[in-house]
Swiss-Prot record:
HAMAP family: HOA. CDD domains: DRE_TIM_HOA. The lineage of its organism: Bacteria, Bacillati, Actinomycetota, Actinomycetes, Mycobacteriales. Its EC number is 4.1.3.39. Residues 4-256 form the Pyruvate carboxyltransferase domain. GO terms for molecular function: 2-isopropylmalate synthase activity; 4-hydroxy-2-oxovalerate aldolase activity; manganese ion binding. It comes from Rhodococcus jostii (strain RHA1). It comes from the Bacteria. SUPFAM superfamilies: Aldolase (SSF51569), post-HMGL domain-like (SSF89000). The record marks 12 as: Transition state stabilizer. This is 4-hydroxy-2-oxovalerate aldolase 7. Keywords: Aromatic hydrocarbons catabolism, Lyase, Manganese, Metal-binding, Plasmid. Substrate binds at residues 12-13, 166, 195, 286. Belongs to the 4-hydroxy-2-oxovalerate aldolase family.
Length: 336
């Protein structure tokens, strides 16, 4: 089979788990360790992508440029990657990231809004970058519709399109159906990627099913560091991939050491499946809403799970973090 492309997201999605607060020196150490461990690509930015630092998403301790520069100083083998959400990050910011050494970008939209990524994907291709389309909250679109959106990204120039389970809501059959739908409509040369979350404890299983269906790009992170219950833990996935006989370039023990020695100590809240993060997956809620919902629950004396269930019922998506307070106030008034 084709060699797997292991995309580490510790230094992007993992930012959600530490409220986007990471010193450049710490980032540099982790990036160097990942590079030495043989991952194919290292994604770096605020958790919500370039220019994500804001009151809505959460301010970062540093700028994207400081973080990217720190990584570029030490990454010599892996492809330095970043994330861009059109409407948050701009083409100008993409171009600046490129001047700092970023050579790959994932352009992310909601599952049904691929059309807003066309200009950004096209410009990234003009810059000579490796480009992936990133269809977030993939559980909110049926397989055929998601595949139609993936085709739009491919037509814009994406080398790869991801099934992106931002809510950690997909089951193995859900992943299988979406990957097959992609394969039915995408050109053979277009790669497919999987981005899993651990909210239902299925991130490794979903990633394995995806690879069995022909996916070659797999997102994962050290100790699963990421939003909600985290991403697919890279050390666990690589162990399984090795047992399966799948080709990759990663050093399992080096990844284990980096996860336990460098990443877990950073966590001010455990990245794990617990009552709150499980509810994210159960309700199909955007994983990065976790910290926002927990903060609102404390402020208004509510159970975080009640907030998350209502958020899921209303089908809120990324960018509507400010609505979480409205949800909390509505819950308070309904039980006054």
């Amino acid at each position: 089979m084709t060699r797997l492309y292991i995309q580490d997201v510790t230094l992007r999605d993992g930012m959600h788990a530490i409220r986007h607060r990471l010193a450049p020196a710490q980032l540099r150490t982790i990036a160097a360790a990942l590079d030495a461990a043989g991952v194919d690509a290292i994604e770096v930015s605020h958790g919500d992508g370039l220019a994500g630092s804001s009151l809505t998403y959460g301010p970062g301790s540093n700028t994207d440029w400081e973080w990217i520069t720190a990584a570029a100083d030490v990454v010599t083998n892996a492809k330095l990657t970043t994330l861009l959400l059109p409407g948050i990050g701009t083409i100008a910011e993409l171009e600046h990231a490129h001047t700092l050494g970023v050579r790959s970008v994932r352009v992310a939209t909601h599952a049904t809004e691929a059309d807003i990524a066309v200009q950004h994907i096209s410009r990234a291709r003009e810059l000579g970058m490796d480009v992936s389309g990133f269809l977030m909250m993939s559980h909110m679109a049926a397989p055929a519709e998601l595949a139609r959106q993936a085709k739009l990204m491919e037509q814009a120039g994406a080398h790869c399109v991801y099934v992106t389970d931002s809510g950690g809501r997909l089951t193995m059959s859900d992943v299988r159906d979406r990957v097959r739908a992609y394969r039915d409509v995408l050109d053979e040369a277009t790669q497919i990627g999987i981005h899993a979350h651990e909210n239902l404890s299925l991130s490794v299983a979903n990633s394995v099913v995806a690879v069995e269906e022909g996916v070659t790009r797999v997102d994962a992170s050290l100790a699963g560091q990421g939003a909600g219950a985290g991403n697919c833990p890279i050390e666990a996935f690589i162990a399984v991939a090795t047992l399966q006989g799948w080709e990759h370039g990663c050093d399992l023990f080096a990844l284990q050491d980096s996860a336990d020695d460098l990443v877990r100590p950073l966590q001010d809240r455990p990245v794990q499946v617990d009552r709150e993060t499980l509810t994210l997956g159960y309700a199909g809620v955007y994983s990065s809403f976790l910290r926002h919902a927990e903060r609102a629950a404390i402020e208004y004396g509510l159970d975080t799970r009640r907030i998350l269930l209502e958020v899921g019922k209303r089908e809120l998506v990324g960018g509507q973090e400010d609505m979480i307070v409205d949800v909390a106030l509505d819950l308070l008034s309904s039980h006054a």
